């Protein structure tokens, strides 16, 4: 995104923001972004519930298979023809109370061995349920990926639309690389974080609830022992994440600053090499790269402690349950298969708890990126567009007591008034920072004036839409801009519906045809953003041809010939005289030779017109303009 010429310089970039302003608020706002995908989200949750429920039931089924095997082994060792009660009484009579307690809690038939058919049916059912759960989890993952992709496409679109609604004053205070990092890196990181966390979050919470219900159904005491570890895990997680979250914010902020430095260095690499600043650029790169490393390492190191810490706490609960459960089996309070199922449930319970702690790492990084993206979406936009369109113009432009300041208290334009009659050429000259370019930026409504009015044919430009206004004005900037495409496509950027003949006509008027005809591919020669193999002057000619093709009713030339050689400049001046006919034109240039034929010349200093007249009149006054011609 290229700011208009004369935009106020940016301040030095601040150090990385080390605090997340509202983690849970940003996370909630992120969840709301999923609302348009309600059907997909409901399908994801439904599949998650079904898959989790099946996965939780299977350990209980496997516990039943264990009971079948154990009952058969014990039953085979007992004499046949007696009941279980008689076998228990016989064991107590022998003084073997431990075996009697164990036997009383079992569903055993004395003299009967293992029912392998029942075991096979039970295991087959468990296998079928495992396969069904796996398919549901797979389908859930695919639908979740689709949900996240659609949400991110919408978010990227919203950010892109927002950028086009932002005033240019926003870009004055932003490095392009930093903004690009928000639109690309941060959204990519957000997408990755959502894909990693949402599925696990839904599945983990459902698993914990379902597993807890199954554990309570087996043994309330063992379930209580397991739950005692949860508050401790949450306290440890909170203590760690409170220290790691600011580092995630700093990491992505530092990444944006690094991208901004690279964008500035690479786009101006010729200047960097010309003035021998490679060492300084490398040193600055290493400083910013080290900032990214330090913040990233600290964030990952701290957040990486969460999972092992919660796993350790979970293992403490596992040991306690193993001891208490063994005692309950020995006393016949629960069966061996039940304690086996309970131990599996502990693993299932601790795993999502550990995953929740671990995914908080990715969630912190994602929310840090989300805050940076939401910052762009929350920026104040340009003032609302009025509906009326600008009528056909004769071209009278009037500034009435216009005042403007980029920053409050620092006026750039002071009580400026001027009139440009239809078809006239108005040249604006003055030292750097005098406010020349600011005048045309105000005419284009790139910025809103502080007070006063700007009228075109008596219509206040603030009362018509910006698009209607800008479609009537052709503007050639000092900094040329080409996009990756052919020369013909770059010229047609001024009016995409133009025919080939119209493109060639505009190119001929700007003398682009003189060098295009020497190229093997002619108008189909591809050029890149930096111009590729064509010269700076040739780039300037292409942008001028683009403006001519747009058929503007007003023309603004900002340093339009300052980057071309003398011969090309003479050709352009000759073409300009013809193209300016019947168009009100504003020319800004430091080369006074380009404005000798202007109808009116305005000499601007510190935002005020200090002299006005044509070339001969101003020379005769021997004032500021005269001194400029002598310099």
Swiss-Prot record:
Residues 1-11 have a biased composition (Low complexity). It holds the Pfam family ABC_membrane. One of its GO terms (biological process) is transmembrane transport. Residues 42-365 form the ABC transmembrane type-1 domain. GO terms for molecular function: ABC-type transporter activity; ATP binding; ATP hydrolysis activity; ATPase-coupled transmembrane transporter activity. It is a multi-pass membrane protein. Keywords: ATP-binding, Cell inner membrane, Cell membrane, Membrane, Nucleotide-binding, Translocase, Transmembrane, Transmembrane helix, Transport. Residues 397-631 form the ABC transporter domain. The chain crosses the membrane at residues 42-62, 123-143, 205-225. GO terms for cellular component: plasma membrane. It comes from the Bacteria. Residues 1-20 are annotated as: Disordered. The keyword Zinc-finger does not apply. Gene3D superfamilies: ABC transporter type 1, transmembrane domain, P-loop containing nucleotide triphosphate hydrolases. SUPFAM superfamilies: ABC transporter transmembrane region (SSF90123), P-loop containing nucleoside triphosphate hydrolases (SSF52540). Its main location: membrane. It is found in: Cell inner membrane. The ATP-binding domain (NBD) and the transmembrane domain (TMD) are fused. This is Fatty acid ABC transporter ATP-binding/permease protein. The lineage of its organism: Bacteria, Bacillati, Actinomycetota, Actinomycetes, Mycobacteriales.
């Amino acid at each position: 995104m290229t700011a208009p010429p004369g935009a106020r310089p940016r301040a030095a970039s601040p150090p990385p923001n080390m605090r997340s302003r509202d983690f849970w608020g940003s996370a909630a706002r992120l969840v709301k972004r999923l609302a348009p995908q309600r059907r997909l989200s409901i399908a994801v949750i439904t599949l998650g519930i079904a898959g989790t429920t099946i996965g939780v039931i299977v350990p209980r089924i496997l516990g039943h298979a264990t009971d079948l095997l154990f009952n058969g082994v014990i039953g085979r060792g007992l004499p046949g023809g007696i009941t279980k009660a008689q076998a228990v009484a016989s064991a107590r009579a022998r003084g073997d109370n431990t075996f009697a307690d164990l036997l009383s809690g079992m569903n055993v038939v004395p003299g009967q061995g293992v029912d392998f058919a029942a075991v096979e049916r039970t295991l087959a059912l468990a296998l079928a349920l495992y396969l069904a759960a796996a398919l549901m989890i797979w389908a859930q993952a695919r639908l979740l990926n689709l949900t996240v992709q659609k949400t991110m496409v919408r978010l990227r679109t919203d950010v892109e639309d927002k950028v086009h609604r932002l005033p240019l004053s926003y870009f004055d205070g932003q490095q392009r690389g930093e903004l690009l990092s928000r639109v690309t890196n941060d959204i990519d990181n957000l997408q990755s974080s959502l894909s990693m966390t949402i599925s696990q979050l839904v599945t983990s919470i459902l698993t914990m609830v379902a597993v807890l219900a199954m554990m309570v159904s087996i043994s309330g005491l063992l379930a209580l022992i397991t739950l005692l570890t949860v508050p401790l895990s949450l306290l440890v997680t909170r203590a760690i994440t409170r220290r790691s979250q600011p580092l995630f914010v700093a990491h992505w902020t530092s990444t944006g600053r690094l991208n901004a430095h690279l964008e500035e260095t690479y786009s101006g690499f010729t200047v960097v090499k010309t003035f021998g600043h490679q060492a300084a650029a490398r040193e600055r790169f290493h400083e910013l790269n080290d900032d990214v490393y330090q913040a990233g390492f600290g964030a990952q190191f701290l957040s990486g402690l969460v999972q092992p810490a919660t796993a350790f706490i979970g293992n403490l609960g596992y040991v306690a349950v193993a001891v208490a459960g063994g005692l309950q089996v020995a006393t016949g309070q629960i069966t061996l298969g039940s304690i086996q199922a309970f131990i599996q449930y502990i693993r299932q319970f601790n795993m999502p708890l550990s995953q929740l702690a671990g995914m908080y790492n990715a969630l912190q990084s994602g929310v840090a990126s989300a805050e940076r993206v939401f910052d762009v979406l929350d920026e104040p936009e340009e003032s609302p567009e009025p509906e009326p369109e600008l009528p056909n113009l004769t071209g009278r432009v009037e500034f009435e007591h216009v005042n403007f300041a980029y920053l409050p208290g620092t006026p750039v334009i002071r009580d400026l008034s001027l009139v440009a009659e239809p078809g006239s050429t108005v040249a604006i000259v003055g030292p750097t920072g005098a406010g020349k370019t600011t005048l045309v930026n105000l005419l284009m409504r790139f910025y809103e004036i502080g007070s006063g009015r700007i009228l075109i044919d008596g219509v206040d430009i603030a009362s018509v839409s910006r698009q209607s206004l800008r479609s009537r004005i052709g503007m050639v900037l000092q900094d040329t801009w080409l996009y990756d495409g052919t020369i013909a496509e770059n010229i047609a950027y001024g009016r995409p519906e133009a025919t080939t003949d119209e493109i060639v006509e505009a190119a001929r008027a700007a003398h682009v045809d003189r060098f295009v005809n020497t190229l093997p591919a002619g108008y189909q020669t591809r050029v890149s953003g930096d111009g590729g193999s064509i010269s700076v002057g040739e780039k300037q000619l292409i942008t001028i041809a683009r403006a001519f093709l747009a058929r503007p009713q007003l023309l603004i030339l900002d340093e339009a010939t300052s980057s071309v050689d003398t011969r090309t400049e003479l050709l352009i001046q000759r073409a300009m005289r013809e193209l300016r006919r019947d168009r009100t034109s504003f020319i800004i240039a430091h080369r006074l030779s380009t404005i000798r034929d202007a109808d009116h010349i305005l000499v601007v200093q510190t935002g005020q017109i200090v002299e006005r007249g044509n070339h001969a009149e101003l020379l005769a006054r021997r004032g500021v303009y005269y001194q400029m011609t002598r310099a």
